[in-house]
Amino acid sequence: GVAKVTLTGAVSVARVTAAGDSAARYSVLEMGAVSVTPSATSGSGFGLSGTLTIAKLDYNAAAAGYARLNWAKAFDLDGNGVWGGANDVLNPSGALALNLPGSVQFGLAGSITGNGNNTGSGGTLADVLLSAGPVYVGGSAAFTLSRQTVDVDTNGDGKADLLGARVDALSLTI
């Protein structure tokens, strides 16, 4: 083979399908502490050695014509008549609860770090991520990306005047 990939972490997924329907009306995906570590085999002339860490990946979707679900308050799983109680949050993995609010469409936070080196060939990089022949690229970066729907007070009077606005946010630290 040319490369090897190691994957670890937690993933939880759920969907809600109305009785009589065949397609899901609501779906959610959450990932946490996911680590992806690829490495190219020696002698290939191409090197890929690093770790992509996904601290969190949240995705909340609804079918056309429906608002996204508030997963933290949508269920009465223990049948006690209280919706969104302590025992009413979906937690299929036991480690990662599905509890996104309806305002969140997606969120991603993570980092990438090179863990190879070219010091054996006289180089000075100790955090090589990618190599191709004599070219080496190294370093690390952290990132976040999110999209949510919120109400916005655009004039500072304490009242929302832009309702249901989409807010996209991105951060990158190198």
For each predicted feature, which ranges?
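N-terminal low-complexity, acidic/Ser/Thr/Gly/Pro-rich segments
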Residues: 1-174
